């Protein structure tokens, strides 16, 4: 795999630096696009083969605003970019990164003076940004999305609408089947075809036809690579998709700060486009989550997204907040041997991100694993008799068990509430927004009060989510109650449900141990079971293993 960029340290930078924690590595990635310059700084954990973002910066540099006659980058655009990149370099060095990797995309690819400008940046700023092809851009976008989304066994169509080009990828958890790039983007369309606004209907129809003609080769290529009967999931990344998600989220009664994983239907997009088209740029800039620069290019971006969905025959897309710049981080990790197999990396994304958050907040890993093991065993033993949930909910229970005590990182008092906040506002890659909310709520209600209508954590849940939390949070209470000491003391347990009575028998590791602490903790859960679901809880010791009981029966 070829190197995307190398970095040169500038010894003249004297900003105060922050060093990474022992065993951690830091790397910065720069995405020099047609519309914006992006910087991310990542903390890489070699042990877990994962990374978390320490900082994300964006500057609207509009490098794609080229001279109409010569096609060259304008002096104004180059100066905006110089200032932004100098800021990026100083931020990266102040965070103690060991390397800055960076790429330049369509604006630099096409401008006659693009390479000369890159040479100047290397000389003056010590940044070696590499111009990449549209196909390489698509590959890096794929890696970025792959790092933050669970592909499971389904193919995914990834659409990234940039300023100068639009990348369309067909991929699954095994390979990128098709990597395409079309020379149609929000800034390019605005520059070439939008002279006055609001657009007349005739101009809108022209733009749709132009976009369709530009995208059709890419769409044909990806659709040919789909096997008969396959139903792909569509993922949309970058500015236009995030703007759509922000606008729809602002209208929602249950808005969330994080847009990653939000699902948007074609009907919602079509209705939004019709509301946006009559607005002026000034009116668009007044919309929630839309700044002045995004407002200028919002309409072309929306038309690209709408046309792509129609051509692909998709009725919904999922928003990803990871794209090219995160792909640069993954690519750096691959090249440095920190990810041996990117497909194994993908298959474990959920488990890895939970472990990453647990380590971040100082969770006792041994105890968390024991609680998670107890919780899953309780889930399996109570299926059908107490609940009818499947493997998806089982995995959410595991994640909540692993992270239930992360709130201790803030304070021991009311730590379950702190756990809810940290989980709900954290970065759980591979989990959807709704799944993350369920995990947080399970952790919130593993102790103390049962859910109440006035609780914010309860108001955010829909009916199905509440059913999951009501039942599985009770199982998590039992799992936590069975692990109150630094070391394991329970060998195994058996749970039997008769009528509305739950009988729980514990087998101690040490036959002489009466497990008084654990039994006391379990008995304290009885009121929650009685008030929460109408079950009576009875706990006792046994000296016979479950396998021996079955043989005797």
What positions do the PLM features span?
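Non-catalytic pre-domain segments flanking phosphatase-related domains
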Residues: 1-26
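Helical "lid/coupling" subdomains associated with nucleotide-phosphate turnover
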Residues: 5-8, 27, 41, 66-97, ...
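N-terminal basic/disordered segments at the start of proteins
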Residues: 21-52
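N-terminal glycine-rich anion-binding loops that anchor highly charged ligand groups
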Residues: 48-63
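A generic, well-ordered mixed alpha/beta core segment in the N-terminal half of proteins
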Residues: 155-169
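Short secondary-structure junctions
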Residues: 484-490, 530-535
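Short, non-transmembrane amphipathic alpha-helical segments
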Residues: 515-536
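A short amphipathic beta-strand at an alpha->beta junction
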Residues: 532-550
């Amino acid at each position: 795999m070829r190197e995307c960029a190398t970095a040169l340290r500038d010894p003249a930078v004297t900003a105060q630096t922050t060093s990474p924690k022992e065993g951690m590595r830091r790397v910065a990635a720069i995405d020099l696009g047609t519309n914006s310059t992006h910087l991310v700084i990542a903390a890489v954990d070699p042990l877990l083969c994962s990374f978390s973002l320490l900082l994300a910066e964006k500057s609207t540099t509009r490098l794609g605003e080229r001279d109409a006659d010569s096609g060259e980058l304008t002096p104004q655009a180059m100066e905006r970019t110089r200032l932004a990149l100098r800021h990026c370099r100083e931020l990266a060095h102040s965070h103690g990164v060991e390397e800055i990797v960076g790429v330049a995309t369509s604006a630099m690819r096409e401008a006659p003076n693009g390479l000369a400008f890159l040479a100047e940046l290397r000389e003056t700023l010590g940044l070696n940004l590499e111009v990449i092809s549209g196909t390489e851009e698509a590959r890096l976008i794929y890696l970025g999305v792959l790092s933050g989304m669970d592909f499971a066994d389904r193919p995914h169509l990834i659409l990234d609408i940039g300023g100068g080009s639009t990348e369309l990828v067909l991929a699954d958890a095994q390979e990128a089947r098709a990597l395409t790039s079309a020379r149609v983007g929000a800034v390019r369309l605005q520059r070439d075809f939008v002279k006055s606004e609001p657009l007349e209907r005739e101009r809108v129809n022209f733009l749709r036809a132009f976009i369709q003609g530009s995208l059709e080769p890419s769409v044909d290529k990806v659709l040919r690579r789909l096997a008969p009967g396959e139903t792909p999931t569509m993922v949309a990344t970058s500015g236009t998709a995030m703007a759509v998600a922000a606008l729809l989220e602002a209208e929602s009664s249950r808005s969330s700060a994080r847009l990653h994983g939000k699902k948007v239907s074609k009907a919602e997009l079509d209705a939004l486009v019709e509301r946006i088209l009559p607005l002026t740029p000034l009116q668009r800039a007044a919309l929630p989550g839309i700044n002045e620069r995004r407002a200028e290019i919002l309409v072309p971006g929306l038309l690209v997204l709408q046309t792509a969905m129609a051509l692909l025959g998709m009725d919904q897309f999922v928003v990803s907040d990871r794209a090219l710049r995160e792909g640069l981080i993954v690519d750096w990790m691959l090249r440095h041997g920190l990810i041996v197999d990117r497909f194994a990396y993908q298959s474990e994304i959920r488990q890895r991100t939970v472990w990453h958050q647990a380590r971040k907040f100082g969770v006792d890993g041994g105890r968390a694993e024991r609680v998670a093991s107890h919780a899953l065993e309780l889930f399996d033993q109570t299926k059908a008799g107490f609940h009818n949930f499947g493997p998806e909910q089982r995995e959410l229970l595991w994640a909540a068990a692993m992270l239930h005590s992360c709130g201790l990182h803030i304070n021991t008092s009311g730590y379950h509430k702190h756990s809810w906040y940290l989980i709900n506002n954290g970065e759980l890659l591979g989990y959807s927004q709704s799944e993350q909310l369920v995990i947080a709520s399970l952790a919130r209600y593993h102790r103390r009060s049962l859910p109440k209508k006035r609780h914010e954590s309860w108001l955010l849940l829909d009916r199905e989510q509440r059913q999951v939390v009501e039942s599985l949070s009770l199982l998590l209470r039992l799992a936590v109650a069975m692990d109150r000491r630094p070391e394991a003391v329970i060998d195994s347990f058996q749970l039997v449900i008769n009528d509305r009575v739950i009988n729980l028998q514990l087998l101690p590791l040490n036959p002489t141990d009466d497990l008084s602490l654990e039994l006391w903790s379990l008995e304290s859960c009885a009121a929650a079971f009685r008030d929460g679901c109408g079950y009576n809880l009875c706990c006792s010791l046994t000296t016979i293993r479950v396998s021996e009981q079955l043989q005797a029966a």
